[in-house]
């Protein structure tokens, strides 16, 4: 596992965007051989999306031959709702780059048959072979996507009940009213995530410090979903300074020395 210890949220977003752009450009995607990118929503990736849009406008990257799969979507929220993840992605990213509409894949939280929708999503991912890079965030309790504590580390795309803590955290997007936050969501599974060629998780803020400590210094544990990264051959965590407050000094020193060349120029 790689840990990229930075200082600010803006630096985390810039590093993540630069990493994605480098991966896409090195892949040299074509219409017949697209780069497959997994994407998250929420507050954490906003700086990364902003940086990606800026790099696209500067001519440094094209998304014309990129196929995307989003991590999750609320159940029962109309896709036109401003807080649906469909709306979020278009507002913050898709509407500002050159990705074709047919290359965008989002779960349908209003599908008449939820199980069939989850199977369809898994099959669509498999039809491309694999996701080349999956970017994600992490919750205070260590959840990735909506794989809440005690999620199976072999799980696939499915419906999940959201914990009260997650709904309270997400209520900031619903005028602070937890009752407006959906109780269920569709989410890719931990196994789906681990199937990706590379997984990059962004961690911001002191409230994520225990989750980061579990991921880097703890044992693999289904109560801390983020620890699944220890099982992945190519996992990278990009974090800001406040999120590292629970890490041992020697752990942080080790990764700072290891990644010194990779964190220059931010």
UniProtKB/Swiss-Prot annotation:
GO biological process: carbohydrate metabolic process; glucosamine catabolic process; N-acetylglucosamine catabolic process; N-acetylneuraminate catabolic process
Site, Part of the allosteric site: residue positions: 151, 158, 160-161, 254
Recorded metabolic or biological pathway in which this protein acts: Amino-sugar metabolism; N-acetylneuraminate degradation; D-fructose 6-phosphate from N-acetylneuraminate: step 5/5
GO cellular component, one term: cytoplasm
Catalyzed chemical reaction(s): alpha-D-glucosamine 6-phosphate + H2O = beta-D-fructose 6-phosphate + NH4(+)
InterPro entries: Glc/Gal-6P_isomerase, Glucosamine6P_isomerase, Glucosamine6P_isomerase_CS, NagB/RpiA_transferase-like
EC number(s) reported in the record: 3.5.99.6
Record family assignment: Belongs to the glucosamine/galactosamine-6-phosphate isomerase family. NagB subfamily.
Record function comment: Catalyzes the reversible isomerization-deamination of glucosamine 6-phosphate (GlcN6P) to form fructose 6-phosphate (Fru6P) and ammonium ion.
Protein name: Glucosamine-6-phosphate deaminase
Annotated source species: Klebsiella pneumoniae subsp. pneumoniae (strain ATCC 700721 / MGH 78578)
Gene: nagB
């Amino acid at each position: 596992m790689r840990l990229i210890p930075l200082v600010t949220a803006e630096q985390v977003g810039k590093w993540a965007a630069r990493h994605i752009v480098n991966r896409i450009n090195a892949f040299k995607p074509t219409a017949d051989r697209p780069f497959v990118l997994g994407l998250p929503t929420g507050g954490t990736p906003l700086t990364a999306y902003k940086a990606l849009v800026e790099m696209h406008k500067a001519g440094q990257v094209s998304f014309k031959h990129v196929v995307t799969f989003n991590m999750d979507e609320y159940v029962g929220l109309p896709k036109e709702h401003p807080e649906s993840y469909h709306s979020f992605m278009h507002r913050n990213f898709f509407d500002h780059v050159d990705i074709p509409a047919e290359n965008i894949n989002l779960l349908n939280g209003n599908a008449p048959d939820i199980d069939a929708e989850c199977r369809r999503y898994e099959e669509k991912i498999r039809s491309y072979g694999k996701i080349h890079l999956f970017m994600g965030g992490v919750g205070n309790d260590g959840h990735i996507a909506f794989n809440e504590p005690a999620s199976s580390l072999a799980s696939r795309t499915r419906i999940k009940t959201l914990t009260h803590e997650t709904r309270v955290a997400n209520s900031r997007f619903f005028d602070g009213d937890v009752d407006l936050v959906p109780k269920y969501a569709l989410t890719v599974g931990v196994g789906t995530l681990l199937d990706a060629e590379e997984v990059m998780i962004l961690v911001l803020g002191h409230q994520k410090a225990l989750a980061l400590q579990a991921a880097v210094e703890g044992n693999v544990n289904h109560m801390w979903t983020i620890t699944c990264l220890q099982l992945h051959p190519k996992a990278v965590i990009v974090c800001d300074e406040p999120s590292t407050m629970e890490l041992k000094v020697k752990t942080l020193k080790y990764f700072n020395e290891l990644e010194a060349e990779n964190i220059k120029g931010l």
